[in-house]
Amino acid sequence: MKKYTFYIIGLMALVFGSCANQESVTVEKNTEKPFFDVKGFFESEIAESKLTKIEKTVRINGESETQILTEFDLNKELSIFLNSDINKPSLFDKYNTFETEFSTTYKTTDKELNVQRIKIFKDKNGDFLKILINRKADTQIYTSDKALTYEPNVGYTIKNAQKVLLSDKKDYEIEVKFQ
């Protein structure tokens, strides 16, 4: 009988212990972003886009070619903007913020970072007007300076000055007008 009593007490402890009011622990991920959400902004622009065609002009060292495209992947077209996000925990202390009435600028002094500066322009109502992004890549093989400009419902421009080791400097510009 003592043997069964031990099992019954153990079973009751297990049943009542599992029914006890337990405090749940919630671990919240820090989703606050200290800088303008570049990636989220462009994901939203892509998702809400109703574009049916774009006019794309490519200029390389002064020569240009223009095409009207009705088949295009806006996600690929804007990928360089999507990849300019600075809201990563490892970058939180790498950028300084400068604000004026109509603009916010995020700038780094770290020459190793690809995104050197982001400047967002808004009108007096706080509506988004334009974003400028300066990217830099500097390796032993090449250097590249890119100036990106995006205007909602208007289009975007990518200007690049690139110098590859043992070759001439190459400038190119991509201008896309939304239609």
What are these regions (language model features)?
Residues F6-L11:
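Sec-dependent N-terminal signal peptides
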Residues A20-E23:
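Bacterial signal peptide processing site
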